[in-house]
């Protein structure tokens, strides 16, 4: 294969390291020249040591400050021609939109819709502007990858894409890194919430369910791992912790070990996910997953077979699904864990995602 110059546009080190390092490793192994546009982070050295060139980029991941966004477009307009890539891979809303606007169809850009986040969950001025920007920018996009059918259907229905798209199984899961482990022994049931502490992630439903279940089953333990994103919801977590309903363990770089210690991973998100990586990694480890009925989550969880689904925003229904798990026999719990692993092996192997990107590199 001819050696190519490839530019990645991302909004955080974790975006590439947690979900795309296998792709980057393979591209480096094949001898391609890689440029990574990322915000400053001490961990960027990981990619520098691989031989990638880091382009420090100021990007406000969640803010809606027009001046900062204009500065980002201006930066991309200057930087992209300087790199002069054969192909651009972008992830998340701002790199997708502003990267495509800046390159203006002069460069082949592959946009990955990793999930719409809070942007399109309710109609607002911000969502209307984002939709308009997507309409303008994605027309200039060479290819669009979707991670779930719900996002794809929305973009097609709204006329944001025509036929320049394909489906991916989320970001995929590294099956070697997330090896199958038997469920923990003992009489205690341990449940794990992994995500930012905020309304969108359904933290209030998790707290409600934790209280209901802990009162009925005192041998239950509910853990919360993630950043404090909204202080008002962190106050609810702290109060629940005082009552003994939950334990907050903060953001964990060793989250794999915590998944192994628990029986269930719970994702009560209200929407905007791609295909949730926490569910893929938990299921691959053999953990039962319980999630809300949203796009992406419903692709991972087969209700009653690999886990349970509950009505989005309904803490009482979440508690009912948790109780279903508790009442299973040890053999039934183990079978559900194995079924989850098998589903990830068959449908969400990260090698599928890597191959899709390598195919685009070969064609460019």
Label each PLM-derived region with a short phrase:
Residues 288-291:
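Short hydrophobic beta-strand element within catalytic cores of glycosyltransferases
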Residues 36-42, 173, 194, 221-234:
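Glycosyltransferase donor-sugar binding loop
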């Amino acid at each position: 294969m001819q050696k190519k110059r490839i530019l990645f546009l991302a909004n955080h080190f974790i975006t590439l390291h947690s979900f795309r390092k296998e792709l980057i490793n393979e591209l480096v192994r094949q001898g391609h020249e890689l440029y990574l546009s990322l915000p400053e982070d001490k961990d960027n050295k990981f990619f520098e040591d691989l031989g990638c060139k880091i382009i420090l980029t100021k990007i406000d991941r969640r803010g809606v400050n027009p001046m900062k966004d204009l500065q980002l477009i201006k930066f991309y307009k200057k930087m992209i021609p300087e790199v002069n890539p054969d192909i651009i891979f972008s992830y998340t809303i701002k790199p997708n939109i502003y990267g495509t606007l800046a390159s203006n169809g002069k460069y082949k850009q592959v946009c990955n819709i990793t999930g719409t986040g809070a942007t399109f969950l309710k109609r607002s001025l911000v969502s209307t502007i984002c939709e308009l920007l997507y309409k303008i920018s994605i027309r200039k996009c060479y290819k669009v990858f979707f991670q779930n059918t719900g996002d794809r259907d929305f973009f097609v229905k709204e006329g944001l894409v025509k036929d320049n798209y394909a489906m991916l199984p989320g970001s995929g899961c590294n099956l070697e890194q997330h090896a199958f482990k038997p469920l923990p022994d003992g009489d205690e049931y341990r449940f794990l919430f992994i995500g930012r502490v905020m309304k969108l992630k359904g933290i209030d439903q998790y707290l409600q369910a934790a209280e209901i279940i802990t009162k009925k089953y005192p041998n239950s333990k509910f853990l919360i791992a993630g950043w404090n994103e909204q202080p008002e919801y962190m106050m609810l977590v702290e109060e629940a912790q005082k009552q003994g309903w939950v334990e907050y363990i903060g953001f964990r770089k060793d989250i794999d070990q915590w998944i192994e210690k628990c029986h269930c991973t719970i994702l009560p998100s209200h929407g905007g996910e791609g295909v949730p990586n926490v569910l893929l990694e938990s299921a691959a480890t053999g953990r039962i997953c319980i999630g809300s009925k949203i796009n992406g989550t419903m692709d991972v969880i087969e209700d009653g077979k690999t886990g349970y689904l509950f009505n989005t925003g309904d803490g009482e229904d979440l508690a009912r699904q948790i109780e279903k798990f508790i009442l299973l026999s040890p053999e039934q719990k183990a079978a559900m864990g194995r079924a989850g692993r098998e589903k990830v092996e068959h449908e969400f192997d990260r090698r599928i995602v890597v191959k899709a990107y390598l195919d685009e590199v070969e064609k460019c």
